[in-house]
Amino acid sequence: MSSFKEFYTTEVVPKLQETFGYKNVMQIPKLEKIVLNMGLGEAISNIKIIDSAVEELKLISGQQPVIRRARKSIAAFKLRQGMPVGCMVTLRHERMYDFFNKLVNIALPRVRDFRGISGQAFDGQGNYTLGVREQIIFPEIEYDKIDKIKGLNITIVTSVQKDDEARELLRLMGMPFKN
């Protein structure tokens, strides 16, 4: 068991039980998955961007990403059905906890002018989405070897349906919210 999952079971779970008064251990909120998504609209004109994005996402997550393809043709964007438009990876279990630990303790503090993340980005179902403007905040990405700075979306899916319970879970796990 990773040390961060151990921290969750020993420190976070008792505090959540005390705060929300859960009677059953299955009611206690937990992380279900973390989805990393890189949308690459400029890949329409340059296919090599997809290859570099897949490699960078593989380094960040430790898992092979899936290339996402366009579902429909859109003439205004010069997009054809089946063209690659991005890549994504879904993390669960040990890799999810390791990535969350790395995100909270290493990557987010490396963001320029970082003062915390917004507490407003919950979707009403207990999931949190965070946009990262630069992939270079992750320690696995070497600044000299990237050809273009790309952003990515990080969606943290929790097992609860209420935003306040999910916010408390993430706060106790070390997510640096503003205020």
UniProtKB/Swiss-Prot annotation:
Protein's gene: rplE
GO cellular component: ribonucleoprotein complex; ribosome
Assembly information from the UniProt record: Part of the 50S ribosomal subunit; part of the 5S rRNA/L5/L18/L25 subcomplex. Contacts the 5S rRNA and the P site tRNA. Forms a bridge to the 30S subunit in the 70S ribosome.
NCBIfam families linked to this entry: PRK00010.1
Role of this protein: This is one of the proteins that bind and probably mediate the attachment of the 5S RNA into the large ribosomal subunit, where it forms part of the central protuberance. In the 70S ribosome it contacts protein S13 of the 30S subunit (bridge B1b), connecting the 2 subunits; this bridge is implicated in subunit movement. Contacts the P site tRNA; the 5S rRNA and some of its associated proteins might help stabilize positioning of ribosome-bound tRNAs.
GO biological process: translation
Organism encoding this protein: Desulfosudis oleivorans (strain DSM 6200 / JCM 39069 / Hxd3)
Any Pfam family: Ribosomal_L5_C
Span of the signal peptide: none
Protein family: Belongs to the universal ribosomal protein uL5 family.
GO molecular function, one term: structural constituent of ribosome
Domain of life assignment: Bacteria
Parts of the chain that traverse the membrane: none
Keyword annotations from UniProtKB, A to Z: Ribonucleoprotein, Ribosomal protein, RNA-binding, rRNA-binding, tRNA-binding
UniProt-recorded name of the protein: Large ribosomal subunit protein uL5
